[in-house]
Structure formats: C-alpha cells, structure tokens
UniProtKB/Swiss-Prot annotation:
Residues 123-171 are annotated as: Disordered. This is Uncharacterized protein F08G2.4. Residues 140-171 have a biased composition (Basic and acidic residues).
Length: 171
C-alpha cells in the first residue's frame, strides 16, 4: 500500500530557491509605473483620484435621485389607495384604525422621500452649474478672522496716543 501522506510545509523556512523566483523584465516593471518615480507629480495623483471619486459620486447622486423619486411615487399611489378605502363608512373600526396607521406611516415615508429628493436635486444642480466639488475648495480655518481683520481700520500710533491723553476727535 503506497503512502500518500505528504509532510506539511515548513513555514519556518519560506525562502524560495533562486530557480523558483519569477523575475519581471524591465519593460514589465515599467508598465506599472506610478508617479512615485516622479516625485514632483505625486500631488497630482490625489487630484486625479478626487476627480474620479467626484464623478462616481455625481453618478450615484443621479441614481439616488431617480430611486427617491420612484419611492415618492410609490408612496403617493399607496396613499391614494388607502384614502379610497377609508371612504367606506361600513368598515370595521379596527380595520379603519389599521388603515389610518398605515396611511400615517406612508405619509412620513413620502415626506422623507421628498426631503431626500430635494437634497439630491441640490447636489445635481451644483453639478449642472459645474461648480467644483467641495473637496477642491481648500478650507481656510482663518478665513472668517481675516475678513473681520480686513474690515477694521488698523489704529495708528497717533490714535493710541490720543486715547491715552483723553483727546477725542469727532469727524
């Protein structure tokens, strides 16, 4: 009877033999060239990836807008059906209560879909205007402070001396 049992691999000695290694030619290595070989271009990688991310999100926003509109239409149709059912005055009070509860939840669902539609429309309107995405607009944390500082007139030394001496001029 032959012994089909193999020894488990030795994980302590994982070094490959030189013959087993696969070496890529210089041409194959250059195919996967990145901007890391061009350090002055590394900053552009971020912009390119941001643009593709932005396009992806713009497409997703359009799909979301369509989905929200469909949800709104479905909820509207169901609301109309339930309102028609409520016109039956011979209905059991329990059943009427259930339908009213369903109607309330559908109205909330419709309002939610409407608010999501408005939000998605805002995003698509910005896209139609070709505004740059928010990620491209560098956030300046000191922007408000700079605005306030530029509005105020800078005091001169004469003004400071006049205040110390109690001299006030009216213009």
């Amino acid at each position: 009877m032959p012994d089909n049992h193999k020894d488990p691999p030795d994980f302590n000695n994982l070094e490959m033999k030189l013959e087993e290694r696969i070496e890529l030619s210089r041409e194959d290595q250059d195919i996967q060239s990145t901007s890391s070989s061009y350090p002055h271009c590394e900053a552009l990688d971020h912009i390119v990836s941001m643009e593709s991310t932005y396009d992806f999100h713009r497409q997703m926003a359009h799909k979301d807008l369509q989905k929200h509109r469909q949800e709104y239409e479905k909820a509207s149709e169901k609301i109309l059906e339930l309102r028609k059912k409520l016109t039956d005055w011979n209905m059991d009070p329990k059943k009427r209560k259930w339908i009213e509860d369903d109607l309330d939840s559908l109205v909330r669902k419709q309002e939610s879909a409407l608010s999501r539609i408005r939000l998605a429309e805002k995003c698509t309107k910005r896209d139609l205007r070709n505004d740059p995405p928010p990620a491209y607009q560098p956030d300046d944390p000191l922007k408000d402070l700079r605005k306030n500082f530029e509005k105020k007139e800078k005091p001169t030394w004469n003004d400071v001396e006049k205040k110390k001496n109690g001299v006030f001029e009216f213009h």
